[in-house]
Each structure stands twice: as structure tokens, then as C-alpha cells.
Amino acid sequence: MAASAHDYAFQTIDGAALPLTAFKDKVVLVVNTASACGLTPQYDGLEKLYSDYKDRGLVVLGIPCNQFAGQEPGTDAEIKAFCETRFNVDFPLTSKAEVKGEGAHPFYKWAQGQLGEPAVPVWNFHKILIGRHGEAIQAFGPRTEPRAPEITAAIEAAL
């Protein structure tokens, strides 16, 4: 198993390689997302959080996922258009990925190894905070709003 989150890579929503080493010395909030979920309005809070903290070193990384009630059925191009037009999302998005089970992206398997069961997404908009050195800091459940005090306090401490 890899030593840090920086040992993993995703693919951007546009199909380019996205090694997490690109975020060395940044704090990263990794969030599995969906466009047709009751929690989809969290995109707004995620974008505000990103806007508030990006100059201090925070990256929000959206991971579209269709594993929860099929609530992210679109293509990567459709997801990107939805996020940009409905929520003015400016933070990076990856191509669709699985976040739990045998087919889970290796990053999520690593996070579970680091943080235990709290790192396993139970629904859309589950959040995992990664520190500047690639360490797994904390996981937050889907109903925890992006700008909730427990998330902003953890981000402040990590920055």
C-alpha cells in the first residue's frame, strides 16, 4: 500500500492524467459527487469553500460517482457542463470513478486503510481531507455541509 495520497492518480474530467503529486504542499478535500442527488446543492458550498481558501493552499477535488442510486448517470462531458453551468464550479473534477467496494479507486482503498470505516463513502458528497504531505487527516459524512465548522476548523489546522 502506498505511503501517501500523493502516490495515486486520477484522470481529469477532460481525460488528462491527474497525479495527486500535483497537489503536494496543498490541502485537498476529496469529495465524491453526483448531479441528481438531494445533496447536489453542496456543489455551491464546495465552490465557496474553494474560493475562500484556494489562495491559502486548499484544493477541492470532485470525484463524480454513479454508485449511489445511479445519481451520476451522465458522461464526463455532461457532468462538466452541469457543474459549470449550474454551480459555476471552478475546482478540479475527475472522470467518473468508483469509491467503494472491490472496484473502488485505489486512493479510496488507501484512505480506508488510513482512516478506517469513516473513510468509506456511504453516499454522495462524502469528504476526505488530505494534508500537505499527502496524509489522510479526517473523513466527513455526506450530510456535513462543506462549510460546516468541523470542516473549516480541520482545513484551518491543516493549512
Q: What is each residue range found by the language model?
A:
Residues 1-21, 41:
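N-terminal "domain-start" segment that seeds a small globular fold
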Residues 23, 34-46, 65-68, 72-73, ...:
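Short, thiol/selenol-centered motifs that function as redox-active sites or metal-ligating centers
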Residues 26-27, 36, 40-63, 84-87:
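Conserved helix-turn-beta segment immediately C-terminal to the redox Cys motif
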Residues 57-74, 90-101:
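Thiol-based oxidoreductase modules, predominantly thioredoxin-like and allied folds used
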Residues 77-124:
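Short, internal strand/loop/helix patches
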Residues 106-159:
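Thiol-/selenol-based redox modules, centered on thioredoxin-like
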